[in-house]
């Protein structure tokens, strides 16, 4: 018999910024690194013989919670990846709801009929993932292993291992970031002992789900900001000059704020010239989503850092909370490259 801990990756950019990231190689967030520390404590007294993960940054980084303290190598396998979301990749969930609501509902509730151009079906995910998991189990007979993967893929796999048909997978729960499930494999196949346990996050007040509402909705739909190129009139309303590019932050057709991007200011650095929400939209836990637009924009251009000036201590505290650090010049800097973070 093989015991397998299935672990979802820590909070990553797609989770924080509410962007569809399947095969997109997003980074771990500041809260995500705290979740990894809590996960390491959770596994401190659990014997593990081998550690596996998908080959994406967010799972490999999360797996450090187990393989580094235990002195084990990390085995990566692309068959453990998240579902490929095709043309959805890189779009916010709110944008997808506005443009493709029926398929969003299918993704959340009717996985047997969900498919988007260029993406995988749920069955295709199962056809690569379960054989890979079976191979891991067979190679580690009599041992205990940890396997790090992704939310949607694990939801599909765990539901299937519980004996549910494809048509019922949409009624199964989502697991929080770093949620742990335990399965056993023997001659009769897989048995799910428990799934989606996140008590190490609840105890530390680090749950991503506790700060989000979408999963509480019956159809699991977003009601959030969306983003469009900013018009000259909107620039004027926000007091943003003509330099660079600007993204309007909107909600229900109403201007809520914006982001000004200055890609020509410094080579290799993505500068933000203006970032904010209008007063009526502040204090509603809406302020961080627009940063995801800047991160994706600048990463595509090859930048490894995002920088901005903060005018007051409150704003500086906000950006520190989300991983920015102060430079010797007094600017706030966020690293968006793929080097390992200590």
Predicted regions and their residues:
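Phosphate-handling substructures
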Residues: 70-127, 194-196, 206
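Acidic, low-complexity terminal tails and accessory targeting/binding regions
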Residues: 87-94, 160-233, 328-330, 337-342
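Active-site-proximal alpha-helix that buttresses catalytic centers in soluble enzyme cores
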Residues: 7-72, 76
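Conserved GNAT acetyl-CoA-binding A-motif
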Residues: 298-311
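Conserved beta-strand in the GNAT
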Residues: 248-263, 269-276
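Conserved catalytic-core motifs of GNAT/GCN5-like acyltransferases
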Residues: 307-309, 320, 325-338
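Active-site-adjacent alpha-helix immediately C-terminal to a catalytic or transition-state-stabilizing loop
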Residues: 60, 130-189
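Conserved acetyl-CoA-binding loop-helix of GNAT-fold acetyltransferases
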Residues: 34, 277, 283-296, 321
């Amino acid at each position: 018999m093989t015991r397998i801990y299935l672990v979802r990756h820590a909070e990553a950019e797609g989770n924080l910024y509410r962007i569809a990231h399947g095969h997109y190689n997003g980074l771990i967030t500041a809260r995500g690194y705290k979740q990894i520390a809590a996960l390491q404590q959770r596994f401190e007294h659990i014997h593990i013989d081998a550690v596996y993960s998908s080959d994406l940054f967010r799972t490999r980084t999360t797996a450090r919670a187990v393989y580094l303290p235990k002195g084990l190598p990390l085995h990566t396998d692309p068959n453990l990846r998240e579902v490929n979301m095709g043309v959805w990749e890189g779009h916010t969930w709110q944008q997808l709801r506005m443009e493709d609501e029926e398929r969003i509902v299918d993704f959340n509730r009717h996985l047997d009929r969900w498919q988007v151009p260029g993406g995988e079906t749920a069955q295709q995910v199962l056809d690569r993932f379960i054989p890979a998991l079976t191979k891991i189990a067979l190679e580690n007979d009599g041992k205990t292993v940890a396997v790090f993967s992704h939310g949607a893929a694990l939801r599909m796999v765990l539901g299937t291992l519980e004996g549910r048909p494809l048509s019922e997978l949409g009624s199964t729960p989502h697991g929080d970031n770093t949620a742990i499930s335990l399965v056993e494999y023997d001659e009769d196949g897989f048995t799910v002992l428990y799934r989606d346990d996140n008590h190490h996050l609840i105890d530390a007040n680090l749950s991503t789900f506790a700060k989000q509402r979408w999963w509480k909705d019956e159809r699991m739909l977003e009601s959030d900001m969306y983003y469009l190129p900013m018009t000259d009139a909107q620039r004027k309303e926000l007091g943003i000059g003509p330099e660079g590019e600007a993204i309007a932050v909107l909600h229900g057709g109403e201007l809520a704020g914006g982001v000004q991007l200055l890609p020509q200011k410094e080579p290799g650095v993505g500068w933000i010239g203006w970032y904010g929400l209008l007063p009526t939209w502040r204090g509603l836990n809406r302020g961080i989503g627009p940063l995801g637009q800047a991160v994706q924009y600048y990463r595509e251009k090859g930048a490894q850092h995002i920088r901005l000036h903060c005018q007051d201590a409150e704003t500086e505290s906000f950006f520190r909370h989300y991983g920015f650090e102060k430079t010797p010049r007094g600017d706030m800097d966020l690293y968006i490259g793929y080097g390992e973070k200590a």
